[in-house]
Amino acid sequence: MTELAAGRGQGGMAETWKDSRQMAIYTALSKKDIGKIVEEFALGDLVNFTGMRTGSVNTHYLIETKRGKFFLKIDEVKSEVEAKQEIDLLLHLRKQNFPCVQPLKTKSGRFHLDFQGKCLTVTRHIEGAELPVDSLNSTHLNALGHALANLHLIGRSYKKGIDNRFGYNRIVAIYREVRRQLPSHLKNIVRVLDDEFSYLESYLDNNLPKGIIHGDLFPDNVKFKGNRLTGIMDFEAACRGKLIYDLATAVNALCFLEDRYRIDRFEALISGYETLRPLSLPEWDSFPNELRFSALRFTVTRIKDFYLRQADDSQRIYKDFKEFYDRLLILRREKSGGMEDVLLAMATGYDYRKYQKSKPSK
């Protein structure tokens, strides 16, 4: 996360804005606003507050008081009901000792405030560092796979439903909206996306294990201290969905480096995952198509954010949709990029691992 704006609580500098054209602060907070929020959540005496560049959807601030550091989020998209569902899920996960953010209560016992018609929450700051994808080693990836499987297992005990805002039908609807307004120079991209939707409509398997998924396991949503995973953040996209889709999204986000899928990274992530939850044969069979749908989902939603978001240009934070469009081309075998080894691992994954478990030890 990158510093955007800062204000000191004790006679320091006034609020300033740095390169706001690229920063995701949709709801600006003054020192007075922050002071009221700190008071309402009983966080202690304000020392400093910093607007954070993190994600493209919501507004975030890091607050420092004499009691420690806290993370403030203003939900710019979700309804109050949807925001409450996210809070409820986080509370459930914390009870199961899952390393996610901890929502805090206000003085009146609520876990959120209404701020200008939007849901505002405060969580404890998770210590550690967000590592760029090229700094993640096999130990990090193994830990991430293990944590994702743990989330999927813990999610079995969470019986409340959370609608999937990024399921296939929803992405189709978003694409139809976007497609009508795309500039003509993207016609080749439109052709590929049209074809991909036609393919996935026929070949996506909906009869796969489902449960609570994170939906957005990117490097900037995870913190480490050394090789130890300290926390998983940003449950904005969490919902009930296919578990293999969640793992496929993690592969797309974590195992793609220098324009190629890396089999060593893939094996480290999958190995960590399967120590807790071995994949079924149908999941292995569906893995390539779930990778394709994940790449398609992020291509479409990033195009939408870029071309259709109704916000002043100075408030936008741009994420290049072509990053995932390029992955999609590789997954479609229209471009080279390391998929041969990964596809082979998927094709033999179930039988190979079954053999390894049954093989007598020497």
Label the model's feature ranges:
Residues 244-278, 294-310:
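Active-site activation/catalytic loop segments of kinase-like enzymes and analogous catalytic loops
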Residues 2-7, 11-107, 225-228, 346-362:
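Conserved NTP-binding catalytic cores of kinases and kinase-like/nucleotidyltransferase enzymes
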Residues 29-40, 159-160, 173-215, 225:
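An alpha-helical support segment within catalytic cores of ATP-dependent transferases
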Residues 177, 298-362:
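ATP/Mg2+ or Mg2+-diphosphate-binding catalytic cores
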Residues 65-158:
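ATP-binding pocket architecture of kinase catalytic cores
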Residues 134-187, 208-210:
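A cross-family kinase active-site recognition segment
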Residues 56-64, 71-72, 103-104, 198-245, ...:
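Active-site acidic catalytic loop and adjacent metal/ATP-binding pocket
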